[in-house]
């Protein structure tokens, strides 16, 4: 039997305790729970690579603002489900400053981390048109987003973008959209875990096809502006973070505080709905809720059913971080550039191993 750092029977027994039939399909959280249990039982420390925890300190700007908010008694008050006005304003400014897109504060909605924003987006998109009951993933992406759809009982399809870069993406994407059952497209850009970035040409294809087939694009910007091959840190100056928002009005941008601002523990993000989409009514939403637009249903029906608002104090933190970044007082990318350095080292290691495998 092959020797391993941890006795195989210990891992097998732990997996069996969780009653996981196919470990290859375990969620990130299940992998973490099993690793923690095996670590305790064996006494052998595990190197955790299943969670995106780079060990960076949280933004001092955010911490200071949140402490002040708590000291002022904000914890006793329910947050407005629409979001803190200051945060909505600064999120709108942030999108203009770093993406060069105009989007009203009204459509910038605080959420309990981008995961909640994605969950609410999936629900809302899937209810717009009864004929469109499927979400399309341009992979690789965030595995838990598929788990969210499994929890909802919603359908999804997926393809890996690796073989469909550039103009090839159009034919592949259209092969799904022309079926008429896709309600939304979701992808991550910059991408985790592959660290690829979609090009302007590819974003244009996605945007134009989304408009043609009347599909909503969910753009996951968790690793905002982390294409360290160019400097995207200067507000209101090119180059800007590439976005599908330049090519369609059918979009929701998912901004996260977890990675760009190392504020993962407080679960804060902003879902930014385009002005046109926010005010658009859909027959499916009218039938289900008796009225409302995409934006009002997203906030006052779906989000409200998930939570009575997003952490009040964390909204003050996010507002302060965005404001400082918008005004050029806080270069948030300087604090997270280690992501790029580590990615570069990993790429070198992977390429070196591939080279050895072919020797």
Where are the language model's segments positioned?
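A non-catalytic, amphipathic alpha-helix used as a structural packing/dimerization or gating element
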Residues: 30, 86, 90, 301, ...
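N-terminal small-domain helix-loop-helix segment of the aminotransferase-like
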Residues: 4-11, 17-116, 167, 322-326
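Conserved core of the PLP fold type I
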Residues: 71, 75-213, 218, 224-247, ...
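Generic structural signal for small/hydrophobic residues in well-ordered secondary structure
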Residues: 31, 49, 66, 91, ...
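Short catalytic/ligand-binding loop motif for oxyanion handling, primarily in non-cytosolic enzymes
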Residues: 55-59, 193-196, 225-227, 260-265, ...
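Conserved core segment of the aminotransferase class I/II
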Residues: 247-337, 348-355
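Conserved small/polar residues in nucleotide/adenosyl-binding loops
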Residues: 357-359
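Short aromatic-enriched loop/helix-cap "lid" or pocket-rim segments at secondary-structure transitions
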Residues: 59-63, 150, 228-232, 264-267, ...
